[in-house]
Each structure stands twice: as structure tokens, then as C-alpha cells.
């Protein structure tokens, strides 16, 4: 029997516990062909490794068939098959449980108590936008996505640096990246005094212009060898710019902005133990960022104990030699291509139509974000130049298009209701979800609505892990939304949702609409994690 919010993870944990101690043997099915006959499978090979001759004891069958507990989905049947031990859920009960509590499956729950504080540092935002490289743009978009996901889960995030270049602020607005701005630089006087006291410059040494002094970092690197710092780091040339960067990080760590939570006990300098610094950098900035990390440790005895680095891989454009294309040029290219593709589809010059201006702006940003974020951030990214990625099923435009189709569907129901064709939407508790027996309906619920929040929570882990780099999977949301769009598009093209206005058809229509309400909420939450508003038309 299910209690509380159902979860794939909770169900798998209970299934594996029912089999007994040892390695996990169950996995969730995802392919439509397999979901026609089962929802979970314990493969024959895994059972043979666990039990003699692969014969599952009767007590295990009974335990699996009577499975229950917090978050565990209700079981219909469990039976041996040539593939292994096959399990199917009570699907109408799962539909009812999930679709009767949409918010708990589409919106992350905030923790009862505040979790760790995160300082998210993106050095690329100190650049002039006209010189911003594509690899730096990738780091900016990854950082913005991480901020949104962490805050959605109730994590207190402080972003560094505040943007001081008004042109950068304007460019970020075009990209729908939310990042604070500031007009004044942070004072470096106190830090300067501290750092100058640590300089050990010989009289014979001549420093380069603009360099205040040299600090040796070799000892720190050797002490933290296991953490993964570059062993070639020897020293750091300290400049005013470097002090300014360090001062911004110090300010963020020591004087946490108001966020509605009480300050750490012990004053503004307390709480470094619960603070995590995440440096999101391009591959070109990674070496210098390690130096800054070590410099902070050397000159500040109140430096946060955990500094993690996320290094974004290089970005190349097919047909463009080297890395000559800048981020603004890339944005203009994609915007022009979106306008051209829409003009070919709808006819006329819609780019000059004020009603379409915002739509094209959103579509071009969606195209960019899905291109930049659909690949694991650490890997190399190759972008197309002459051909736009707005066509096909793996583009941001495809996702936005299907989100708009959902909006059109519900607008169509509303219009039909106003005309008296359809009754008002009944209470969800009165709906008969046993009428949802199309395989596409279960695919949408089981592969998308049910596991969505679990997937979202796996984007980044703040658990204390060894090493310099933080495990993140910022590609997961984009890939999930693309797959959801493909499943929804297939279902929508095949099934007529708004049927004829006949009373005996309303039950199935409302059950389907409630399912698609859940799909719509998942779409909206997923797009919000990317800073993209849903469109009502394309």
C-alpha cells in the first residue's frame, strides 16, 4: 500500500530489500515496448547470481507482491518470465495517487530547515560581453541553471561577482540569465594589508608592471595533492584585479545577504563549515581559478572549508576556425536563424511584427540554452554554424513548440466550456483514472511526471565528496524535456483529447486533461530551471 508521495527510488529500494541483502537487482523500465507488459524487472542473470539456479524463493515472491511503505507504489502482480522477475504496478491507483496531488510531483519541496550555504562564483561575468568566448558563455549558462536548481530546493545561494558592466547586464537580460549587478567595487584595503604582509620579495627580483608581489603556493599544493590541484602550480603573482576578485569572495562568505534565515550563531564570521564555494569556469580559466582558490586559503584563516570547481569543456563552431565567434555574435546568429525559419513556416516578415518579437527572443534563447546545456558540461561541445538546430526533435524550439501545443489544448477546452460544449472541470477526486489505458498515457506518467523531481534533485549534489571537482549533471533537465516532448508529441498526434461533446465521453476526456495538466506543470517547472517562460503560441 502506498503512503505519501510515490517515488521511483523508494519503490526500487523496497523491491531490493524484499529480495534480501546484496547488490541491487531491480531496475525501472523506460522503453514503451517493455512497459506494455511490466514496470520493473529483476533480470534473470542478476537472479542467478543471487539465488542458486536462479530459483527465487517463495518468501521473496510474497514479500514483493505485498510490497508497501512510504513512497512505495502499489503492486498488481509479480511473475517469473524468460527475461527475469517481472513486476507490474496497479496503474489506475498510481494515476489516482499522482494526478490527485500534482504540486507534490511538479514542484520541489523546500526543506524544513535551511541547508548549506552556497557561494556560486562565475569569473566569466567580469568580462566585457563583446569579448566573451563561447566557452565562457557556456559557463555562465551552467552557473545560472545551477543557481535556479539549488534555490528551487531551498538552498541559500549567493552569486559572485555582481555584474558591474551595464553592457554585460543587458546581454544577460537578453539571455534571460538572472544575476545581480552592482555599481561599486568591493574595498580591498584590509585584504591588501594582509597580503602585503605575506610577501617575501628579494631585493634583486623585478616584478612585472602592475604586480604587487609574489606568493608561493607550492607548499599548499603539496599538502592538498590528493584533492587534485594542478601539481605545476608554483606561485601566484598578486595584482589589484586579483585582490578585487578575492575581496568579493570574502565579502560573500563573511557577510551573507539577507535571505529570511537567521545568521549563523557566532556572528557574521561564523558558519564557514556550512558554506560551499562552487567555482564555475571555462577550461581556459581553470588553472588561474585553482591559483585563486589556493591564494584564498593562504591569506584568509576564515576561508570556507569546501571549495569545488566545475570546469566547462571547450566549445567549437563547425566551419569557424579556432574560437573566433563571440557570445554576442552567436546570439545574433541564432536569433536571425530563428526569424528566418519562422518566416519560411508562416510566411511574411514576422520579425517586424511586435506581437512576435518576444516569441522570437525566447525561441532564440531556448535554442542557445538547449545547445549549450544538453551536453555534460565537462565535455567538448560542437555547435553547428550554417544549419540551425530548431528543426528535429532534440532542439529547444521543439520543446517550446510542444509546450505551446499544451497551452492551445487547454485554451481550446476553455473556449469549448464557455460555448457550453463541455462542462466545468469536475473535482479530481471524482475522476475515473481506470479510463487511462493507452500506452502513451502510462508512458507520460511513469517516465516523466512520477520521476521528475527525483531527476531534478540529481542535477547537483552538495554532499561532501573527495576531490576538487563537484559532480553535476546539468544536461539532465534538457534531455528530460526533449524526451518528454517526444512522448507528448507522439501521444498528442495519435489521440484526440477534446472529443465530441457527448456526456459518455467526458469521463475519459477529463482524466486525460488531468494527466496533461501534470505534464504541463512538469514542462513549466523544467523550463523555469532554464530561465525560459512557456509560450502560448508559436
Swiss-Prot record:
It comes from the Eukaryota. Gene3D superfamilies: Isoleucyl-tRNA Synthetase, Domain 1. One of its GO terms (biological process) is tRNA C3-cytosine methylation. Pfam families: DALR_1. One of its GO terms (molecular function) is ATP binding. InterPro entries: DALR_anticod-bd, DALRD3, tRNAsynth_Ia_anticodon-bd. Involved in tRNA methylation. Facilitates the recognition and targeting of tRNA(Arg)(CCU) and tRNA(Arg)(UCU) substrates for N(3)-methylcytidine modification by METTL2. Part of a complex containing tRNA(Arg) and METTL2. Interacts with tRNA(Arg)(CCU) and tRNA(Arg)(UCU). Interacts with METTL2. This is DALR anticodon-binding domain-containing protein 3. It comes from Rattus norvegicus (Rat). The gene is Dalrd3.
Amino acid at each position: 500500500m502506498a503512503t505519501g508521495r510515490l517515488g521511483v527510488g523508494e519503490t526500487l529500494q523496497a523491491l531490493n530489500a524484499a529480495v534480501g541483502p546484496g547488490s541491487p537487482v531491480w531496475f525501472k523500465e523506460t522503453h514503451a515496448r517493455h512497459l506494455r507488459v511490466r514496470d520493473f524487472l529483476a533480470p534473470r542473470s542478476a537472479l542467478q547470481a543471487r539465488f542458486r539456479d536462479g530459483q527465487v524463493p517463495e518468501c521473496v515472491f510474497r514479500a514483493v507482491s505485498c510490497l508497501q511503505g512510504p513512497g512505495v507504489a502499489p503492486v498488481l502482480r509479480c511473475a517469473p518470465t524468460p527475461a527475469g522477475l517481472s513486476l507490474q504496478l496497479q496503474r489506475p491507483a498510481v494515476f489516482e495517487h499522482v494526478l490527485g496531488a500534482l504540486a507534490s510531483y511538479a514542484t520541489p519541496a523546500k526543506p524544513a530547515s535551511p541547508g548549506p550555504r552556497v557561494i556560486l562564483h562565475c569569473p566569466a561575468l567580469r568580462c566585457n560581453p563583446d569579448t566573451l568566448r563561447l566557452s565562457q558563455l557556456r559557463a555562465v549558462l551552467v552557473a545560472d541553471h545551477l543557481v535556479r536548481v539549488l534555490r528551487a530546493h531551498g538552498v541559500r545561494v549567493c552569486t559572485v561577482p555582481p555584474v558591474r558592466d551595464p553592457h554585460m547586464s543587458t546581454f544577460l537580460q537578453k539571455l534571460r540569465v538572472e544575476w545581480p549587478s552592482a555599481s561599486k567595487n568591493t574595498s580591498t584595503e584590509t585584504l591588501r594589508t594582509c597580503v602585503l604582509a605575506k610577501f617575501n620579495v628579494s631585493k634583486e627580483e623585478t616584478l612585472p608592471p602592475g604586480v604587487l608581489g609574489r606568493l608561493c603556493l607550492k607548499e599548499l599544493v603539496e599538502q592538498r595533492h590528493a584533492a587534485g590541484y594542478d601539481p605545476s602550480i608554483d606561485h601566484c603573482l598578486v595584482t589589484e584585479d586579483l585582490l578585487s576578485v578575492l575581496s568579493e569572495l570574502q565579502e560573500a562568505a563573511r557577510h551573507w545577504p539577507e535571505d529570511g534565515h537567521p545568521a549563523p550563531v557566532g556572528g557574521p564570521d561564523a558558519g564557514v563549515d556550512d558554506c560551499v564555494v562552487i567555482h564555475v569556469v571555462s577550461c581556459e580559466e581553470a588553472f588561474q581559478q585553482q591559483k585563486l582558490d589556493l591564494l584564498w586559503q593562504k591569506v584568509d584563516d576564515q576561508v570556507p572549508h569546501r571549495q569545488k570547481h566545475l570546469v566547462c569543456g571547450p566549445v567549437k563552431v563547425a566551419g569557424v576556425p579556432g574560437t573566433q565567434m563571440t557570445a554576442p555574435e552567436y546570439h545574433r546568429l541564432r536569433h536571425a536563424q530563428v526569424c528566418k525559419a519562422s518566416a519560411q513556416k508562416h510566411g511574411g516578415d514576422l520579425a517586424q511584427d511586435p506581437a512576435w518579437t518576444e516569441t522570437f527572443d525566447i525561441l532564440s534563447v531556448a535554442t542557445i540554452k538547449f545547445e549549450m546545456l544538453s551536453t555534460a558540461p565537462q565535455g567538448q561541445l560542437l555547435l553547428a554554424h550554417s544549419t540551425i538546430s530548431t528543426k528535429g526533435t532534440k532542439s529547444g524550439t521543439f520543446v517550446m513548440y510542444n509546450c505551446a501545443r499544451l497551452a492551445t489544448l487547454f485554451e481550446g477546452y476553455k473556449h469549448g466550456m464557455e460555448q457550453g460544449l463541455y462542462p466545468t472541470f469536475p473535482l479530481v477526486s471524482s475522476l475515473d483514472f481506470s479510463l487511462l489505458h493507452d500506452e502513451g498515457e502510462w508512458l507520460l506518467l511513469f517516465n516523466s511526471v512520477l520521476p521528475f523531481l527525483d531527476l531534478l534533485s540529481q542535477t547537483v549534489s552538495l554532499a561532501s565528496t573527495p576531490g576538487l571537482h563537484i559532480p553535476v549533471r546539468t544536461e539532465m533537465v534538457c534531455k528530460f524535456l526533449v524526451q518528454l516532448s517526444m512522448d507528448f508529441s507522439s501521444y498528442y498526434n495519435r489521440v484526440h483529447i477534446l472529443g465530441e461533446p457527448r456526456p459518455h465521453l467526458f469521463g475519459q476526456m477529463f482524466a486525460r486533461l488531468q494527466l496533461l495538466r501534470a505534464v504541463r506543470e512538469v514542462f513549466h517547472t523544467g523550463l523555469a530551471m532554464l530561465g525560459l517562460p512557456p509560450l502560448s503560441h508559436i
